[in-house]
Design a protein with these regions (language model features):
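Acidic interhelical loop/turn segments
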Residues: 21-36, 104-140, 157-171
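Alpha-helical transition-metal enzyme core signature, strongest for iron centers
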Residues: 13-20, 41-56, 97-107, 139-150
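Alpha-helical interaction segments
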Residues: 44, 74, 89, 135-136
Length: 172
């Protein structure tokens, strides 16, 4: 069985998302809205999920019209993440877990449906010209960057390290 580029990207995006989920699950509950010399934990998680969701979308129009966004319009409201301003909203753990579930399904569907030709096409979701293939790898790095940021916070607060997830979805 030959492993495709789509499968590799999907497995690595899922591993990064699972690492972020591990952060949400292991963050001490009283710390979810606390700042630690940067943004509150819940804002970092939301930012990471938001751009996962955004970059896996075909266009801004389809991004805004997703059922998940419509059902949670009070949370997405003004889409502050797309503006050049400091975020102000805080997010509850239950919502963050729902958003993780939404992103997990979107990763699986997007990478199962995309063709080799589409991977080489320009990704319209970025101002800078970049292929979808490179955008997905950049997205994986972005997710892992923030998971590491939050994982270090958790380790400092609890003394516990995150478990390494090599490939695919795994829960601890």
């Amino acid at each position: 069985m030959q492993t495709t580029t789509q499968t590799i990207i999907k497995q690595q995006l899922l591993a990064s998302l699972a690492t972020l989920k591990q952060c949400v699950d292991t963050c001490p509950k009283e710390q979810i809205h606390e700042k630690h010399n940067d943004y509150p934990f819940s804002q970092v998680v939301f930012h990471t999920l938001f751009y996962c969701d955004f970059y896996l979308s075909k266009s801004k129009g389809t991004f805004f019209k997703q059922d998940f966004h419509i059902k949670n319009k009070n949370i997405f409201a003004d889409y502050e993440e797309l503006e050049y301003r400091l975020p102000t909203k805080l997010y509850e753990i239950a919502f963050l877990n729902q958003y993780i579930g939404h992103c997990r399904k979107k990763i699986e569907k997007t990478l199962e449906d995309i063709t080799d030709i589409e991977l080489k096409q320009n990704a319209k979701m970025r101002e800078k010209e970049i292929t979808k293939e490179e955008l997905f790898i950049d997205l994986c790095r972005h997710m892992q960057h923030h998971a590491a940021q939050l994982g270090l916070r958790i380790q400092i607060l609890t003394g516990n390290e995150l478990q390494w997830i090599t490939s695919g979805w795994k829960e601890y």
